[in-house]
Amino acid sequence: SGDGDSASIGIGQFIHAIRRQINMVYFVENNGTYGLTKGQFSATNDLESKNKYGEDNLFKPIDLASMAIQLGASYVARSFSGDRDQLIPLIKGAIQHKGFALLDIISPCVTFNNHDTSTKSYDYIRNHNEAVGKTDFVPLGEEITTSYKSGSSIEVNLHDGSKIALEKVNSKFDPTNPGKSLSYIR
C-alpha cells in the first residue's frame, strides 16, 4: 500500500488489521506525497518539508511505524528502498513472522518529491539513513525445549553451539509486584 492510502483514506483498515493481529505482511511505500495529485503532501510527510513548488507542510506527520507499535503489531521495521543490505533481511523476517508485520519503506517519489527541500528525497534519505541495529535473517531451526524445576537453573545448548543459562523463579515469587521483580533481575 502507499502512504497516502495507509495514513489517510485507508487508515481505519490499517489500524484494525494490526489490532486483530491478522497474519500478514503489510508493505508501505512511503514517499510523503500523493503522486496522482502531482505532489500534494501525504499524511506521512515531515513538518519541516517543502513540496516541489516550495510550499511548506503545515501538519505533523502520521508515523505509521510508531502507530503500529502502539497498536500491538508484533513485527515493525522501517527501511530505505535504496539500502538492499538492510531491506532484504527485513523482508525475509517479515515473511517468516507469524502475526501482523509492517514494513514502512521510505521510497522517494522521483517525480514530485525528490528535491533539496524534501525530507523524503533520495539524497536526504541516503545522507540521513542510520540503521538502529544490524539486521540479519535467522532461518527457522528445530524448536529447543527444556524442563526444569522452580528455583533451579539449567544451561541450554543453542543451534549455533553457544549456550544460555536459564533460571526459573521460585513458585512463590509474585511477578505482579514491580519492586520485587526489579530487585530479582538486578
Explain the meaning of each model-derived region:
Residues 23-27, 66, 74-77, 100-102, ...:
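Structural motif
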